[in-house]
Amino acid sequence: MVRTPCCRAEGLKKGAWTQEEDQKLIAYVQRHGEGGWRTLPDKAGLKRCGKSCRLRWANYLRPDIKRGEFSQDEEDSIINLHAIHGNKWSAIARKIPRRTDNEIKNHWNTHIKKCLVKKGIDPLTHKSLLDGAGKSSDHSAHPEKSSVHDDKDDQNSNNKKLSGSSSARFLNRVANRFGHRINHNVLSDIIGSNGLLTSHTTPTTSVSEGERSTSSSSTHTSSNLPINRSITVDATSLSSSTFSDSPDPCLYEEIVGDIEDMTRFSSRCLSHVLSHEDLLMSVESCLENTSFMREITMIFQEDKIETTSFNDSYVTPINEVDDSCEGIDNYFG
């Protein structure tokens, strides 16, 4: 449906309004009030279009129009209303008292819009420019870097999982090999002494500090064993169920979930192993004990052959490994 024009274009005056025309319009509106803009030009004796008369009155001649600079409250209201109505200036002007839609539009384009851009806000969406354009431009400008970074994260995660599984399998082998030997030696000590032994069970990680001190004090009283530093091992605590023959890394899946769990497991496992007199040695003596180092390296050699397809895989002796953190990680990685 086509809207009919408010008046005929023939004989109408266009361009700037004169002072005489303004006085005629003001006098007519004061006598008859606002409205009836289609018939007003003929009644007021004006050679203007009805729409032109309405806009001239609303934007310039209305007596309650507020002139001058916009206050901070008015600017905040304009920003909030623009976020709702967009560029519908007439709808915004109805919410701002004594301000015209044309004046609000001009103030938006010349002042408010520039201030929003300086603050990092998109004047169209009223959202942060960094949240939208910043992140998308970074990914679009460097798509290869972002994809490579994601691939590295996935690879590091997989390496950590493989490292945890291999470490658990290796610790299982060490505990299994030395655990059976300790059981055999402890039983031999029991038979040789012709009686039961006062045992000292290594406390687990769940034991409190008070119990540890009590346990350590009781250790000094158990001196009836011919074992170095008066430390004995409870044979029941090192039964065959303690050390599994299976090198399945899933056996310790819940224990070695992360680095801290691996550390606690290693301490608990080695506390049983190192309780035996053959293994009570300092770091220096361990390095000097070639048979001990040879057996540890042999265990690691067997583990590597089992997990790889090469039967001739060479493993550097453990006492020849660089003792730095990087060297240890490379050796067990």
From Swiss-Prot:
The signal sequence is none
Biased region (Low complexity) positions are: 156-166, 204-223
Q: Which CDD domains match?
A: SANT
Specify the superkingdom. Eukaryota
Protein localization = Nucleus
Compositional bias annotation for Basic and acidic residues: 136-155
Q: What GO cellular component term, any one, is given?
A: plasmodesma
InterPro entries tied to this protein: Homeodomain-like_sf, Myb_dom, Myb_TF_plants, SANT/Myb
Give start and end of each HTH myb-type domain.
Answer: 9-61, 62-116
Give the matching SUPFAM superfamilies.
Homeodomain-like
| Disrupted-gene phenotype | Low levels of indolic glucosinolates and loss of responses to brassinosteroids.
Q: Which UniProt keywords apply?
A: Activator, DNA-binding, Nucleus, Repeat, Transcription, Transcription regulation
Q: What does this protein do?
A: Transcription factor involved in glucosinolates biosynthesis.
Q: What does the record note on quaternary structure?
A: Can form complexes with MYC2, MYC3 or MYC4.
Protein name as catalogued: Transcription factor MYB122
**Organism field:** Arabidopsis thaliana (Mouse-ear cress)
At the highest ranks, the source species' classification is: Eukaryota, Viridiplantae, Streptophyta, Embryophyta, Tracheophyta
What gene makes this protein? Answer: MYB122
